[in-house]
Design a protein with these regions (language model features):
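Active-site cofactor/cluster-binding pocket
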Residues: 1-197
């Protein structure tokens, strides 16, 4: 079965874009897929838009960068504009729910898209620091090719040292992952032009 998934994630520095990309890449690799990730920072680096490219396949991946993504994630106002070049007709645009006006301004009503109120959920139910893990869970749920356990193992590898210092962080990250995963599963195979969670 042919499988090749191209994901671009973008947000402000500090929003955890690179961490989310590393975790999904690690989880994919552990699940037996070929996976490559490459970071791309704005010219300002600090204070610029951070973009991560992830490519996952059953076959060897020659380069993680691509011109059009299957899924493109935008987590900030500047990221909505920054990822425009990677959004094609069939691309699913996943974005922070508070960016609806920005998305409409840049993409109109034509783009397949999914608004996820990840920041609101993180602030109201958990902690703002797990905002990116909610988005990660949404990606895992939408795509359906990874098990939550694979992602939990990747989280352990990435954040295990922090979990050891504060065991509550593990539970918080696992809850955020599960919450995002549930949202993604509900929206799996999103085909409508606009979907709100």
């Amino acid at each position: 079965m042919d499988f090749n998934l191209k994901i671009a994630l973008a947000g402000e520095g500090g929003q955890g874009v690179q961490a989310a990309a590393e975790i999904i890449t690690e989880a994919s690799y552990r699940a037996g897929f070929q996976a490559l990730y490459i970071p791309n920072f704005g010219v300002e680096q600090r204070g610029g838009v951070s973009v991560a490219f992830v490519q996952i396949s059953r076959e060897p991946v020659s380069a993680p960068k691509f011109t059009t993504g299957d899924i493109v994630v935008a987590l900030s106002t500047r990221a909505v504009e920054r990822v425009r070049q990677y959004v094609g007709e069939k691309t699913l645009l996943v974005y922070e729910g508070g960016l609806e006006d920005d998305v409409r301004r840049v993409y109109g009503e034509k783009q397949r898209r999914l608004a996820v109120p990840a920041l609101f959920i993180a602030q109201e139910e958990m902690h703002p620091r797990v905002f990116n893990v909610i988005i990660l869970g949404v990606l895992v749920g939408i795509t359906g090719f990874l098990k939550v356990e694979d992602v939990q193992q990747a989280l352990e590898r990435q954040l295990g040292h922090k979990f050891a210092q504060d065991p509550n962080l593990r539970e918080l990250n696992y809850r955020a992952l599960a919450r995002g995963y549930d949202i993604g599963r509900q929206k799996q195979g999103v085909s409508s032009k606009r979907t709100n969670v």
